[in-house]
């Protein structure tokens, strides 16, 4: 039931059915209501009194609620795991996970015996109503009936039931009807069954006295056995599934509180059943049968259904333990049978043990070990959550002190209920934990020195082999140097670059740490003081700190990239240094990628010259260049992630240095002029894995790239901007179904213009499976020239497995651009225009009439291309266009005006320029 293994209720392993919160609610609430509420609760109220009962109910469900809250947190963070053991292994250390799984296995085993014993008591109640006895009318009859029910439960676990969900819903509906009739006093209360309890005759252990508070608490606490149920369900959970477990606990608590209240004010009709043997009238006897026998049947069905669930849970856990490397002694139990991997051996073994446990006695006896086992398990789980919360306070688990208090209360309650049994359980956990800790440490001591050494030497040897590989065997791999600044400030830009590399080629996130100025006369922070100075030992220490944080953030976001931070006073020089020094051997970047500089027309000449210098240096080094623009929302999210205009992270000094204030290379369409610069390094760095696995249409799981989703604490972002920020952060992570990429091949400047969109259509990209359309221009007007160019382009497309029918040759390129387009272009660059001087060339960042006249043909071509892009591709999901070449004779304002016009008012646009190597010279290797 809970796992993909041994699931007679769920769909097959290959099914894409997902469990929503309603399914989880039914799995959790069924055992919490049927057993105690209908079987023992009225006697508990009579013996303990109203006040004591309310206190016990409050404590019981408080423990269950806090434990369920922690369990939902674990499932939300590790929802990709299947089953209880794998989820615990992913969340905790190996020794604790295995030891805790052993304790929880005993809990489920005893709970199964308790459920079947309760069902057997209900069956015996029916027999006693008709004065029937099988053996002795006492414990022997109970053992016989529970054994038969155990065999039925075993058969149900092995037989697949396609309508299990409907059966569960039907039995839950019957249980709710029985509870409603009981609470409304339409029927006689089945709770008066206390007069029909099974005799202690032939019992191994006599029932404890009912007047003791520990006995009453032990009879009540099995109602809270489902605090950890959600950990068994596995990865077939929708995002709202944890809600079902918490709702089940809350609903059960309301039922028990209402029952105690109604019992106290005597809303129920009380009818003695002790004298209904032969002296009562016949009509009264029939009325008694009609009111109690259906209730007993409902309890029997509910208990058997709960036993089926717990037995499956236990079998799957035992099978998982057998498959773990730490429990090789039970390897023979790991084998599964059939397509659904049913753990038949585990089921047979556990059923045998369960029958022996059920033979001990009735519910009044078995409820004590069940209570002690679950209390101890809850104490261990909440204490470990407390330790995890101390190490990482950002985890959305219960408050630290609350987890510690619940853990201590559970441990004390287990000792109070039965101290001998509690100490025995503690010894089981201690022995298993210490044994596993010893085994794991011994293995680490034996292999710990060899594994890192062998890994290092093998990787180094492979690097040498790669360096010495002959040219005839070398293939082109896109190795990207991304000038992202702080990756936490621009997660969308990093995600887009990772969609191209997908961990199969090199990706380096470069961060150039500049020297900042303190123009306002105010006290400087320590970080600002360091940045005022020239690069020195202290600034290098800060560089190492930032470099470590970048790599930690990349690892937490599951981006296969390396961080590279350097100290340099100028951005262009820093980019040039990174291009020359980043990487090792053959693993060196051959593509420079950066974001589009939004608002360049409002910046100074020095700023745009700095930006243009990075591009021209890349062209001089003959590496590919990619400029990515996301005009809709931009990349920089730090200016939006605010609380009342102040940084929300604690490390304000470092945040002001690490965030978007340096360097301004990405699109900042969402930036506001008066917003302070402090941002969110710590919030992004401490992002945790979440259950937010997007579902495609029809309930399908998204591609493997969706496993890289993360969440931010909802209180860390102002409410009005939360949706906008989340859309910016995950824009290039969510897979877009039926996507389309339009490629505008303006000229052959290297195969990168076609290679980049091809890589974006591969598995793991947000545009996986996208349709590619290619637009190109023709220089000739005759059909012969057009056909020749079409054949050349078709040959290029075949290399990328693109159908030639998706090629469109546009003769409209020869037309001049409209006046409005040209006026918009001139409005952007006129600020930087200077008068023509005979003394020499204009200063950097400006141009004169002669330069704009000499570049008139290129300007006309690019402006016309911008019009055609908006005409044909306004509804595309991504536009890839050839990037103009940045030559020294081209003024930076004119060049930035070209790329601005090519990418404005369009979907996300990727301007690409290859390394000037033709397609025929590139040795590309495709899957």
From Swiss-Prot:
UniProt keyword Metal-binding present: no
Ranges of the Extracellular topological domain: 45-53, 117-141, 187-212, 266-284, 367, 416-419
GO cellular component, one term: plasma membrane
Transmembrane segments: 24-44, 54-74, 96-116, 142-159, 166-186, 213-233, 245-265, 285-305, 346-366, 368-388, 395-415, 420-440
Compartment list: Cell membrane
A single MF term (Gene Ontology): sodium:potassium:chloride symporter activity
Its membrane topology: Multi-pass membrane protein
A GO biological process held by the record: potassium ion import across plasma membrane
Regions of this protein lying in the Cytoplasmic compartment: 1-23, 75-95, 160-165, 234-244, 306-345, 389-394, 441-927
Keyword Chloroplast: no
Coiled-coil regions, chain positions: none
Residues the record marks as carrying a glycan: 275
Assigned keywords, A-Z: Cell membrane, Glycoprotein, Membrane, Transmembrane, Transmembrane helix
Pfam families according to UniProt: SLC12
Family to which the UniProt record says this protein belongs: Belongs to the SLC12A transporter family.
This protein's name: Solute carrier family 12 protein B0303.11
Organism: Caenorhabditis elegans
